[in-house]
Swiss-Prot record:
The keyword Translocase does not apply. It is an enzyme of class 6 (ligase). It catalyses: L-glutamyl-tRNA(Gln) + L-glutamine + ATP + H2O = L-glutaminyl-tRNA(Gln) + L-glutamate + ADP + phosphate + H(+); L-aspartyl-tRNA(Asn) + L-glutamine + ATP + H2O = L-asparaginyl-tRNA(Asn) + L-glutamate + ADP + phosphate + 2 H(+). It comes from the Bacteria. This is Aspartyl/glutamyl-tRNA(Asn/Gln) amidotransferase subunit B. Disulfide bonds: none annotated. Pfam families: GatB_N (PF02934), GatB_Yqey (PF02637). Keywords: ATP-binding, Ligase, Nucleotide-binding, Protein biosynthesis. Heterotrimer of A, B and C subunits. InterPro entries: Asn/Gln-tRNA_amidoTrfase_suB/E (IPR017959), Asn/Gln-tRNA_Trfase_suB/E_cat (IPR006075), Asn/Gln_amidotransferase (IPR018027), Asn/Gln_tRNA_amidoTrase-B-like (IPR003789), GatB (IPR004413), GatB_C_1 (IPR042114), GatB_Yqey_C_2 (IPR023168), Gln-tRNA_amidoTrfase_suB_CS (IPR017958).
Length: 484
């Protein structure tokens, strides 16, 4: 039997406000346990929550960026459950009327047949407070509770069950991560828990309309774990069904050490949480003027910039998507193009995605820390275009020296110091090619007999004779001319 995978994601995005969603306490990461927990966060008697306007504004920014509807009136609700790190005994969230409704995110997915585009529909995004943190490893035989995180503002972003593979889920998560960081509403630090995903996974026979029973994999804080967890869960569910067992709706955890998921508890439904409107908070009202002001202050969005890079610079959709993965990378690329000219936009993209990206990954640094700045890379590209150096020499000899800071990263100075300038004297090059042809009569004979490989051998000999300083295109042209 053929099976179809059905995936929906719920992503908890920690909003980048200086203070918590219902109190004035700092949200800074890394403080000593319980030093950033106010009476509101501790749920002491007599305290009342006050909504953080900045959290609402960030939710509006996100909603506008995905083409969602911003609810003119939304309601906060109490989600009731008991857990040691939830001091109130309930979480303030949104249930029936969330602040952001609908919306779409378009993703680029690498499939077996190449890259394809897919649109993922969003159900909603709602504001809520984070819980505290249980510390299981700090005390022998006991669990500690750190309430510094309690009350930190979250935007929970929920998709429709639109994804059909772990690759699509990861592509969506990466696109969402890129968007919230681009907007500046979240720092995106997955190690610190600023961006974490829950994956709802089920399987059904191909062609069946009814969804299978889903299991929710909680708190996945890396794209690799997201993919591994979904892949394992899918295979587990298929094996269970094919062995005649029934899937039970449950919440599961992923163990990175074993690569397996394991059930944590039977999955609750909404009625188990006994949602009801929070009597301590007035309904949130957002007027059109507020929405319009936020809209006017939005930066150019990744999707808009991607489309512009395709139309203005002739990039492929995939290359444009790669370059706009972060705002800083896109700004770097566009600065290179501004300096070198739009005619070199495609080579500039190749260099940014190739040599620049490779060095950044190798050294574990960001584009802002790259020692080769846009104007310097633009000068190197100009020297390739005007024939001063070949692309190969630029990659092998000039760029590494620029990255190392030689000659203050100036391409012209490095080319001169290392004697890398291509031969510009056509007469001298013709003489060298004549000598190569005379010394390689057998290759000449083989080429004239129809063996194309012999021509490549002659090109190689000519480049060797010029110590790599000849322009390969010019060598090809002269050889073809002389060989008839």
């Amino acid at each position: 039997m053929q099976w179809e995978v059905v995936i929906g994601l719920e992503t908890h995005t920690q909003l980048s406000t200086a203070s918590k969603i219902f109190s004035g306490t700092s949200t800074a990461f890394g403080a000593e346990p319980n030093t950033q927990a106010s009476p509101v966060d501790l749920a002491l008697p007599g305290v009342l929550p006050v909504l953080n306007r900045g959290a609402v504004e960030r939710a509006i920014q996100f909603g506008l960026s995905i083409g969602a509807t911003i609810a003119p009136r939304s309601i906060f609700a109490r989600k009731n459950y008991f857990y040691p790190d939830l001091p109130k005994g309930y979480q303030i969230s949104q249930y029936e009327i969330p602040v952001v409704q609908g919306g779409q995110i378009t993703i680029q997915v690498e499939g077996k047949q190449g890259v394809y585009e897919k649109t993922v529909n969003l159900t909603r995004a709602h504001l809520e407070e984070d819980a505290g943190k249980s510390l299981h490893e700090d005390f022998a035989g006991m669990t500690g509770i750190d309430l510094n995180r309690a009350g930190t503002p979250l935007l929970e972003i929920v998709t429709e069950p639109d994804m059909r593979s772990s690759a699509e889920a990861v592509a969506y998560a990466k696109a969402l991560h890129s968007l919230v960081v681009w907007l500046g509403i979240c720092d995106g630090n997955m190690q610190e828990g600023s961006f974490r995903c829950d994956a709802n996974v089920s399987v059904r026979p191909v062609g069946q309309e009814k969804f299978g029973t889903r299991r929710e994999i909680k708190n996945l804080n890396s794209f690799r774990f997201l993919q591994q967890a979904i892949d394992y869960e899918v295979q587990w569910q298929i094996a269970e069904i094919e062995d005649g067992r029934e899937i039970v709706q449950a919440t599961v955890l992923f163990d990175p050490d074993t690569g397996e998921t394991r059930a944590m508890r039977t999955k609750e439904d909404a009625h188990d949480y006994r949602y009801f409107p929070d009597p301590d908070l007035m309904p949130l009202e957002i007027d059109a003027a507020w929405v319009e002001r936020v809209k006017s202050e939005l930066p150019e969005l990744p999707a808009t910039m991607q489309a512009r890079f395709v139309s203005q610079y002739g990039l492929s959709a995939y290359d444009a998507s790669t370059i706009t993965a972060t705002k800083a990378l896109a700004a770097y690329y566009e600065a290179v193009v501004t300096n070198v000219g739009a005619a070199s936009a495609k080579p500039a993209a190749n260099w940014v995605m190739g040599e620049i990206a490779s060095q950044l990954n190798r050294e574990g640094i960001s584009i802002d820390e790259a020692p080769v700045r846009p104007a310097q890379l633009a000068k190197l590209l100009a020297r390739i275009t005007d024939g001063t150096v070949s692309n190969n020499t630029a990659k092998k000899d000039v760029f590494p020296a620029m990255w190392a800071g030689e000659s203050d990263g100036d391409a012209d100075a490095i080319i001169a110091a290392k004697g890398l300038k291509q031969m510009s004297d056509t007469g001298e090059l013709e003489k060298i090619i004549d000598d190569v042809l005379a010394a390689n009569a057998k290759s000449v004979e083989e080429f004239r007999a129809g063996k194309e490989k012999a021509f490549n051998a002659l090109v190689g000999q000519a480049m060797k004779a010029t110590k790599g300083k000849a322009n390969p295109a010019q060598v090809n042209e002269l050889l073809k001319k002389k060989l008839g």
